[in-house]
Amino acid sequence: MERQVLLSEPEEAAALYRGLSRQPALSAACLGPEVTTQYGGRYRTVHTEWTQRDLERMENIRFCRQYLVFHDGDSVVFAGPAGNSVETRGELLSRESPSGTMKAVLRKAGGTGTAEEKQFLEVWEKNRKLKSFNLSALEKHGPVYEDDCFGCLSWSHSETHLLYVADKKRPKAESFFQTKALDVTGSDDEMARTKKPDQAIKGDQFLFYEDWGENMVSKSTPVLCVLDIESGNISVLEGVPESVSPGQAFWAPGDTGVVFVGWWHEPFRLGIRFCTNRRSALYYVDLTGGKCELLSDESVAVTSPRLSPDQCRIVYLRFPSLVPHQQCGQLCLYDWYTRVTSVVVDIVPRQLGEDFSGIYCSLLPLGCWSADSQRVVFDSPQRSRQDLFAVDTQMGSVTSLTAGGSGGSWKLLTIDRDLMVVQFSTPSVPPSLKVGFLPPAGKEQAVSWVSLEEAEPFPDISWSIRVLQPPPQQEHVQYAGLDFEAILLQPSNSPEKTQVPMVVMPHGGPHSSFVTAWMLFPAMLCKMGFAVLLVNYRGSTGFGQDSILSLPGNVGHQDVKDVQFAVEQVLQEEHFDAGRVALMGGSHGGFLSCHLIGQYPETYSACVVRNPVINIASMMGSTDIPDWCMVEAGFSYSSDCLPDLSVWAAMLDKSPIKYAPQVKTPLLLMLGQEDRRVPFKQGMEYYRVLKARNVPVRLLLYPKSTHALSEVEVESDSFMNAVLWLCTHLGS
């Protein structure tokens, strides 16, 4: 019998990629004020923001679209789009005022380089631009932060001031030999470096400023800034402790001050992106006296504080610090008037049956409170799905809003006055936009969802979730009885399964997970004729805290065994072509892929990795997350730790490079030269080792790309190269 014919011609694969990459992704949504028509009908405007790959311009474009939702207070009566999509160029942040009558927009304009770009803060009212402030020209601070870690754009409750976060203004610096600045009448006072406010400091032009690591290289020392909209005056708030970097700020009740999260940056900064374990606390700074008050435990990590509609309580997420980067979190509640903090939802060690398995989201949506300030709505991975939940902050009860559905994954974009705006997708259905009202307490599972934007499903992709129980010899001694899952995609129109090749994808992290949502690469591969196995090995998020804690100290062993076990089980049950199995993974997924071709060289016929961890020991001194190297190798981390020989040996023992002599699988390496998380020298180290052993290996080095290789030009090129590599070495 002939083998399964793969879509292997470059032109065909490129055409398929071009078509699928046009699927847009939802990035944000907000709800306008309620409007009552002259006939008594009520409606609200839904403003949505989307991103889409543009292969002609080789960039991600952003666009917006508005919808009208007519309702009766409890349910949606009618909903539909209000006009076509419009591209939003230059918008970095935007936020509606509390009343919905104004909108603030942070916009970049000017040249292509960061030095030439200018930032403007605009205030819009109805059909006109009311105010525009050239923040770059005012020189009160550096660039404004637009990221979701530190960044914010918050209206005061009075709608007279705007709060945002920007980089602290740096003093000017110049050479010791800058002749135009030379003053022949210089005195001893000048030599003592007593400077005028804007006078340049000699010899500081190469002074090192720490940043916050991967994807945050332009962020160093954030400050809280307040713009008086009427006068145009900008104030940089004082009172923030010198030892912390502020972010995620909002106005306190009554506009008396500002609440913010402060991250410790002493003795040095660690990478903060995708790391919910960075020591931080909740603070309040009073605007009248500049006094700063600590509102939470300062020995843990906190994120995404959200003020209730009645301005009485603040809910936020809390995680242990300096342990695994992502883990099960606590939902905490701070009462503004009693000053009491309570834990609403605690860490869940292990899921029991169909019960809630814990909170694993890294951020709460900006809008997450119910109208009565009693319930909080959020999304979180639960095993291999992502569901919506409502938690009663008084009772601590957690109820699923999406249980018993079609098995796809949900994401909450916002909720306001109990009207929820959500995204839904599956591995075979791209994201769709839905709205629905939060039912009364006790009836949460009765949500009636109405679609605003539907995506066409792909009937030629079928998928399922496989539950896997490790064999007894692979059980964890301390955390026995843990299972794990894998999501299997396969062509639904395949004539003969025994001829279908399979691509195995372990996720990165390692403490993250695949969920049953739309993913471009797996969908592409499946439409090309591959089965795709996405493995959530033990240590993945969504399966309870015990599962996460089982992996540190066992990387390179437990996770590798889990992936291999999943592969063998699926091959046995589905009867795919065992002679054509390939691996594809990035970061820790690349780490596992390189382990697997070394530990099980007979199983895999091809391998593609992106920015893989190859040698934990050599990575520790160059990564922005040295704590990852220590913790995942099974050791505790502190900022002053100096590993001894036994620690270095353990790191090396758990690294893929240990098994390099056994590797014979053809390998495609794809590296980002600007990667701060897993520096590209890791992949180079492996490349040279394999080249010296005559293993077929190809290296693609993307000069300006970072860890995710997510730039449109890089992503598209890397996918095409990966596809051709698989087709070459698996046979078409």
From Swiss-Prot:
Q: Which reaction does it catalyse?
A: Cleavage of an N-acetyl or N-formyl amino acid from the N-terminus of a polypeptide
Q: Which residues carry this modification: Phosphoserine?
A: S187
Q: Where in the cell is it found?
A: Cytoplasm
Q: Which PROSITE patterns match?
A: PRO_ENDOPEP_SER (PS00708)
Extract the GO molecular function terms from the UniProt entry. omega peptidase activity; serine-type endopeptidase activity
GO cellular-component terms in the record? cytoplasm
Expressed in which tissues: Expressed in the liver (at protein level).
Q: Which residues carry this modification: N-acetylmethionine?
A: M1
**Source organism, top-level taxon:** Eukaryota
Show the active-site residues: S587, D675, H707
UniProt xrefs under InterPro entries = 6-blade_b-propeller_TolB-like, AARE_N, AB_hydrolase_fold, Pept_S9_AS, Peptidase_S9_cat
Quaternary structure per UniProt? Homotetramer.
Describe its function: This enzyme catalyzes the hydrolysis of the N-terminal peptide bond of an N-acetylated peptide to generate an N-acetylated amino acid and a peptide with a free N-terminus. It preferentially cleaves off Ac-Ala, Ac-Met and Ac-Ser. Also, involved in the degradation of oxidized and glycated proteins.
Give the family from UniProt: Belongs to the peptidase S9C family.
Which protein is depicted? Answer: Acylamino-acid-releasing enzyme
**Taxonomy of the source species:** Eukaryota, Metazoa, Chordata, Craniata, Vertebrata
